[in-house]
């Protein structure tokens, strides 16, 4: 009987909670959906959204960026939640500075916009380790993104943390806040297809777990393909999504990532996507019944510190409508703003019916929407990538440029065509102008440690790099000694032995007896590398010091626990009397990071711990420092590091990211790419033969009026004489 009474009490409590939530929803509004659209307060909406990632800009930049998004007629701001930024150590959370998620969402709310929160917690996003914290890799028994108990436990803890935080701050729409959508997982469909049953079980667990958190708004899964749990909305990602149809026809047609450009990888040209094609893709999606469209990215921003994914540049500009610095990219920004205005004029008709489609020619169509109240909207499309055509619609003639769509909000008058770009007058172009040059530099040469240097440890094996560093530093030293007899033939001939080092990546600097012998590096397509060349050695003890560097951790895939970096071998020395000596299994010593990192010479306190001298140019492993006063004005600032090699830079102790200016872009470029025809990330490329990135964003808010400390670490060998501070302007 006692158990029965407890059950009745529990049922009454559940009813009470349900009634309470219902009452709150009635007061503040609710979010749901039908086959046609997301419904807010029971009203169907055509929602235009843009991705802005809060850690990729500064809190001081957020209000202006959000306001420009609003001014462009967006309704929603979309962002990932970055697990490794918020929980860098297990159980120790961080929600301050650029990671102040609550502040970011409240600013969006103040601007009158909605939020789509992509909790994931896998992000991809060309972000270091896909947003996963590295400590997760070392949870016993873990396998990432599959039906694995340890992984699911940690994922649920973090997802719950975020949902509970949003509830506590009353940020969900039913609480009066801006969040109208959540996302669980990210682009998992291809992974599930690859791994089969464990992936399917994980998918359905993730959806159920998300729903159990009672966030009170719909959950989506993007790029989920065929296996879609009933309690989530499946959505599309890509350059085009007009043909996408949700698996369940009762769900709306949503596009979570319309790629406005593409990311830049070191050693490759800079991709861009013509404004006409972006506009065409949006109009085509809307005319085909789409009701939620998000630009990925609307503002890309900067990969500060070491947050960039593998071989991804520090700039995450993405050719977005707002550039890396938060300035409008013209004509893309204005062209899309005008598109949004036209679509909003059509919204009453769009949400009232399905389209009636008629052929206007061999490659032309009309999509017409109408409502019982008399509103009417038409989209006239020309899919031909080469030819403009004239079509007749409702007794009127319209000229449609190639690969374009005209929008008629009243089914009579064209107010917008995706291929007709009305640029601001006069035309606006961004440019970089030096504001401070001829800086007074000093330098400190870092140490090349050896096998018996202080702070090293020794093992008879080669260790995987991240197992040692836990990604606290990009660098790991591998050191061993080789003893050679004076009777070696190569010594008598005046020759040199051949050292071969195989590494899982990404960059290797080889020193023998303290002298640089050479470098090797991989690429995004092939991160593994092999250093193989002659090295200078003498009779007696020869000290080999290998500096292995990562350029971001992998951000795609599923078995993150298996990803390896660093020197894994084999390591061999050939050209000896004995033939080839295998060094792989002899004793190796290890040291994490550089001496300069250990001393924190990049901030004002640590800078005093080492002896600085005149600048040593074009030398490896050198730290450079200088000071400067902040230039006047409010224009965004950047460092021109085009004369440098590879390393990292800091302003007043804050890292502006990795630099790799001497990695020259290889490929075929077309600075006047034709907008018409299907776009891919390799269609339109610029800056071939130039540095993949030479300008590095310096946030204004990181500067003080006088005496700003600038520190640049150079791995390769650069020349600071040509380093300058520039301002970015639009004129």
Swiss-Prot record:
Stated family: Belongs to the glycosyl hydrolase 35 family.
Tissue specificity remark: Senescing flower petals.
Protein's name according to its UniProt entry: Putative beta-galactosidase
EC number: 3.2.1.23
Segment forming the signal sequence: 1-29
GO molecular function: beta-galactosidase activity
Record key words, sorted: Glycosidase, Hydrolase, Signal
Top-rank EC class of the record's enzyme: hydrolase
PANTHER family referenced in this protein's UniProt entry, alphabetically: BETA-GALACTOSIDASE RELATED
Induction: By ethylene.
Residues the record marks as active site: 187 (proton donor), 257 (nucleophile)
Keyword hit for Lipoprotein: no
Single Gene Ontology BP annotation: carbohydrate metabolic process
One matching Pfam family: GHD
Catalysed reactions, semicolon-separated: Hydrolysis of terminal non-reducing beta-D-galactose residues in beta-D-galactosides
């Amino acid at each position: 009987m006692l158990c029965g009474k407890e059950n009745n009490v529990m049922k009454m409590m559940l009813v009470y909670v349900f009634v309470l939530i219902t009452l709150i929803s009635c007061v503040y509004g609710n979010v749901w959906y039908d086959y046609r659209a997301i419904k807010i307060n029971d009203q169907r909406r055509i929602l235009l959204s843009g991705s802005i990632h809060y850690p990729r800009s500064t809190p001081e930049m957020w209000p202006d960026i959000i306001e420009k998004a609003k001014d462009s007629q967006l309704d929603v701001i979309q962002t990932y939640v970055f697990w490794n930024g918020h929980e860098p150590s297990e159980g120790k959370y961080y929600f301050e500075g650029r990671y102040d998620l609550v502040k970011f969402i409240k600013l969006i709310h103040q601007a009158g916009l909605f939020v789509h929160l992509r909790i994931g917690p896998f992000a991809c996003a060309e972000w270091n380790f896909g947003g996963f914290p590295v400590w997760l890799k070392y949870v016993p028994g873990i396998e990432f993104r599959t039906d694995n108990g340890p992984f699911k436990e940690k994922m649920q803890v973090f997802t719950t943390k975020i949902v509970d935080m949003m509830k506590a701050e009353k940020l969900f729409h039913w609480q009066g806040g801006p969040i109208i959508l959540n996302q669980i997982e990210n682009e998992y469909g291809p992974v599930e297809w690859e791994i089969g049953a464990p992936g399917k079980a994980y998918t359905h667990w993730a959806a159920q777990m998300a729903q159990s958190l009672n966030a009170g708004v719909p959950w989506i899964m993007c790029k989920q393909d065929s296996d879609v749990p009933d309690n989530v909305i499946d959505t599309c990602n890509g350059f085009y999504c007009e043909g996408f149809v949700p698996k369940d026809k009762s769900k709306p047609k949503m596009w979570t990532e319309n790629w406005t450009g593409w990311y830049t990888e070191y050693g490759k040209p800079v991709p861009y996507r013509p404004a006409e094609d972006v506009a065409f893709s949006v109009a085509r999606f809307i005319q085909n019944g789409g009701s939620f469209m998000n630009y990925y990215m609307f503002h890309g921003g900067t990969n500060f510190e070491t947050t960039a994914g593998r071989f991804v540049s520090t700039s995450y500009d993405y050719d977005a409508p707002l550039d890396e610095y938060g300035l409008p990219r013209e004509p893309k920004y204005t062209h899309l703003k005008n598109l949004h205005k036209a679509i909003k004029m059509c919204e009453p008709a769009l949400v009232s019916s399905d389209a009636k489609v008629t052929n206007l020619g061999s490659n032309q169509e009309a999509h017409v929407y109408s409502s019982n109240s008399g509103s009417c909207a038409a989209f006239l499309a020309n899919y031909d990538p080469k030819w403009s055509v004239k079509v007749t619609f409702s007794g009127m003639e319209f000229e449609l440029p190639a690969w374009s769509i005209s929008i008629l909000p009243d089914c009579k008058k064209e107010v917008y065509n995706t291929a007709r770009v009305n640029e601001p007058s006069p035309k606006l172009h961004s440019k970089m102008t030096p504001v401070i040059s001829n800086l007074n530099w000093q330098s400190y040469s870092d140490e090349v440690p050896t096998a018996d240097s202080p702070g090293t440890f020794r093992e008879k094996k080669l260790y995987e790099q991240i197992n040692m560093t836990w990604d606290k530093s990009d660098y790991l030293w591998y050191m061993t000694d080789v003893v050679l007899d004076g009777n070696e033939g190569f010594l008598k001939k005046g020759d040199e032995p051949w050292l071969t080092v195989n590494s899982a990546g990404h960059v290797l600097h080889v020193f023998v007896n303290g002298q640089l012998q050479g470098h090797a590096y991989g690429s995004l397509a092939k991160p593994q590398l092999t250093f193989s060349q002659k090295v200078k050695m003498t009779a007696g003890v020869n000290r080999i010091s290998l500096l292995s560097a990562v350029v971001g951790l992998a951000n795609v895939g599923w078995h993150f626990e298996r990803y390896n970096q660093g020197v894994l071998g084999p390591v061999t020395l050939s050209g000896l009397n004995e033939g080839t000596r295998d060094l792989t299994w002899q004793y190796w010593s290890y040291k994490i990071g550089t001496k300069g990192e250990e001393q924190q010479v990049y901030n004002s306190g640590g800078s005093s711990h080492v002896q600085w001298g005149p600048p040593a140019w074009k030398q490896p492993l050198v730290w450079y420092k200088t000071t400067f006063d902040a230039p006047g004005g409010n224009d965004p600032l950047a460092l021109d590091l085009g004369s440098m090699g590879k390393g990292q830079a800091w302003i007043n102790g804050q890292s502006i990211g990795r630099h790799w200016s001497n990695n020259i872009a290889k490929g075929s470029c077309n600075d006047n790419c034709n907008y018409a025809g299907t776009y891919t990330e390799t269609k339109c490329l610029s800056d071939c033969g130039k540095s993949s990135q030479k300008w590095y964003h310096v946030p204004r808010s990181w500067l003080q009026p006088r005496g700003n400390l600038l520190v640049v670490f150079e791995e390769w060998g650069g020349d600071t004489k040509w380093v300058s501070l520039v301002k970015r302007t639009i004129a």
